[in-house]
Amino acid sequence: MKTFVFHIFIFALVAFASASRDSAKKIGSQYEHYATCLTENDAAADDIFTILDITSGHHKNENEHDKQHKNGCVMHCLLEKDGLMTGADYHEEKIREDYIKETGAQPGDKRLEALDTCMNETKDMTDKCDKSLLLVACVLIAEDSLATSTEASTEA
């Protein structure tokens, strides 16, 4: 029993350390075209929100409008270069396929439901930059919320 509890503790510690490390990452920085998209949008890495900025809601600060738009344009560039968007239009099936590959989500996974909800909530937006940032933010916030609720249910 002690060994089982110890393994659970180690698993939780590794998950926490991984989440903390990931939260400091700049959104989109793990993708191949990140540097190109920064250059194409006259952005520096310091201009880009971290995952924590998004999940904590800091990106919604009214004083951050220019930064929000710049972040959105970088996200749009990444999505377009990966074939997930053309202009302001999503390629929904391709987005789902790539998301499944990246996350390992299976049918019925709440993350897929969240992705669909996020696409539906933003699909009618016409500004491609704002639309891209809101999609990415929506997905990151949903993933964070789902992870938090999963952690809470395993602790109970």
UniProtKB/Swiss-Prot annotation:
Residues 1-19 form the signal peptide. It holds the Pfam family PBP_GOBP. One of its GO terms (molecular function) is pheromone binding. Disulfide bonds join C37-C77, C73-C129, C118-C138. Keywords: Behavior, Disulfide bond, Pheromone response, Pheromone-binding, Secreted, Signal, Transport. One of its GO terms (biological process) is response to pheromone. GO terms for cellular component: extracellular space. It is found in: Secreted. It comes from the Eukaryota. The keyword Transport applies. The keyword Signal applies. Colony queen number, a major feature of social organization, is associated with worker genotype for Gp-9. Colonies are headed by either a single reproductive queen (monogyne form) or multiple queens (polygyne form). Differences in worker Gp-9 genotypes between social forms may cause differences in workers' abilities to recognize queens and regulate their numbers. Homodimer. Belongs to the PBP/GOBP family. This is Pheromone-binding protein Gp-9. It comes from Solenopsis globularia littoralis (Fire ant). The gene is Gp-9.
